[in-house]
Each structure stands twice: as C-alpha cells, then as structure tokens.
C-alpha cells in the first residue's frame, strides 16, 4: 500500500462535499494541492519514498500503473494481485485477460487506456488493506487522475468505487450509474462496475457488466 506524506508529496486533501443535482446525479467535489511540476514519474517516486507506508518501508514492490500518460479512459482497480506483483503491471493473469476482452468488446485496446489501482502494494503478510492504508494511498490516486486527465473513469470493484466517490453503497448499488468527479479545475464522469476478478467467480453478473461497458462506450462518444 502506498502511503502518503503531505509535506513530501505536496498533495493535501482540500474541500470535500457532494452536490445533488435536480436530476439526482451525484457530483463528487474535491480540491487537492499538487506540485507545479507534477507528473506520473514524480508521483511514482513519491509513492516509493513514502515514509508512512508499512509496505513501502518493508520493501514491498510497487505496482503503480500502466498506459499512456494522457488517456481518454482511466481504469481504476482495487489493489494488485500476485500476478501483478510478479510483472510490476496492473490487471495481469485471468482477471487481466478478461478485462482485455471487455475492452475489446467496446472497440478499445488495453494500450489505449491508463490502468492503475487505489492501492499500490500488497501489504506485508498479504492481509487485507486497512482504512488507514487506503486513505494514505488516496491522494496519490487523485494526483494520478489529474496527471492523466481522462475523459472517463471506470472504477472496478467496491473498494475502488467507494474510495473514489466516498460512498458506503455496495458495488451493486453503485454500478449502472454515472457519477461526476469534480477535481480541482477538472470534471469527469465516473462509472463504477464489477471487478473482472469478481466476474470470474460470479459469471451471472457479466450481463450487468456488459450494460456498464455500453454506457462507457456512449460516454466516450460524447
């Protein structure tokens, strides 16, 4: 889990609130301070140098992200798996293969998208992520979003969607809806859906995931 030290990275959480529009759409509004010369390379260096992250201090490998530095679609997962740690890249193994097929179904190649996770490391002992570790990682994720500046964000799985949107709803309640993230001077739609690893276990949810993918396709056409 990549931790966070505000004085080192220059990223500090700011105003946080939700705005409910007349049509019921939820806008998540946040402000975060970033270094003037921020970049994916700088964010990755800050992740690896984090003094508060137990995983980083223990020398756990970091899985930061993959894809073009400017991408129309940004895909955010929960945290790296064993296959990801071995390769240093997110969404490897069977779940990654399914994700590739999902993207191909809406005429997108993996190489066109920026992929990352909320959590950047596997915790020592491969235990579950703590709330503190998730919060330590979150500012790095927001900086990644600002750097990539995607047109659309897909949040895969409950942890990714809940962390990004500050929601306590389940992924089944969140999916199928388009949220808006207003981050500093940027505004982008966020669409939560099921994690491919979950779809491998619960195949009957693939129909709902396909409905979500069609919505992503429509958002990218706008």
What is the predicted role of each segment?
Residues 1-222:
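A polyanion-binding, active-site-adjacent surface
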């Amino acid at each position: 889990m990549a931790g966070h030290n505000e004085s080192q990275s220059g990223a500090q959480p700011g105003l946080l609130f939700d705005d409910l529009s007349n049509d019921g759409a939820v806008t998540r509004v946040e402000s975060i301070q970033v270094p003037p010369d921020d970049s994916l390379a700088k964010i990755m260096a800050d992740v690896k140098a984090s003094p508060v992250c137990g995983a980083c201090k223990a020398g756990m490998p970091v899985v930061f992200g993959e894809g073009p530095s400017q991408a129309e679609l940004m895909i955010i997962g929960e945290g790296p798996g064993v296959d990801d740690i071995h390769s240093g890249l997110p969404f490897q193994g069977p779940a990654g293969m399914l994700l590739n097929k999902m993207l191909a179904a809406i005429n997108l190649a993996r190489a066109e998208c920026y992929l990352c996770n909320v959590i950047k490391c596997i915790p020592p002992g491969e235990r579950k992520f703590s709330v503190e570790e998730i919060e330590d990682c979150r500012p790095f994720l927001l900086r990644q979003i600002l750097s990539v500046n995607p047109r659309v964000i897909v949040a895969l799985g409950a942890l990714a969607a809940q962390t990004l949107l500050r929601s306590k709803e389940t992924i089944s309640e969140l999916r199928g809806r388009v949220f808006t993230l207003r981050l500093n001077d940027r505004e982008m739609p966020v669409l939560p859906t099921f994690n491919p690893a979950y779809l491998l276990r619960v195949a009957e949810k693939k129909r709902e995931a396909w409905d979500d993918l069609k919505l992503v396709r429509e958002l990218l056409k706008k």
